[in-house]
Regions:
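Noncatalytic partner-interaction/assembly domains of nucleic-acid and motor enzyme complexes
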Residues: 1-111
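Short, intrinsically disordered, charge-balanced linker/junction segments flanking boundaries
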Residues: 117-120
């Protein structure tokens, strides 16, 4: 997958804020969950987080809490990956009140729709 086919095009902070938006905005998560693919993320930690959010949201119709993610994290046997996931969640949580989350959501929806059209 080419660089422009990944959310890395928008940078690390963008992806971190996207995770924050998914964790706190149920309506946004519902809107994008079916077209947001883990392959759009370069980082294995981000892919793991997105996968957990998708799985949990599909089953329970709400994003997982940090407590749920902490419990799921116990299944990760790779210490380096586990540390990376914890750090990513910390960084994401710092952005839950960012003033540009609406912009992040709009850009993500556009990106995912374009990727879906490309793949059709």
């Amino acid at each position: 997958m080419a660089q422009h086919d990944k959310l890395a095009t928008y940078g690390y902070s963008f992806q971190t804020k996207l995770i924050a938006a998914l964790l706190i905005d149920k309506l946004f998560t519902k809107q994008i969950i079916d077209i947001l693919d883990v392959k759009y993320f370069e980082s294995e930690a981000n892919s793991w987080i997105i996968s957990c959010i998708r799985e949990h949201f599909t089953k329970f119709k709400v994003a997982p809490t940090l407590e749920v993610l902490k419990i799921k994290l116990q299944d990760v046997t790779n210490d380096v990956l586990r540390a990376s996931i914890v750090e990513q969640l910390r960084e994401s949580w710092k952005h839950i009140e960012s003033t540009d989350l609406d912009f992040i959501k709009d850009k993500t929806i556009d990106f995912c729709k374009n990727q879906t059209i490309k793949g059709a």
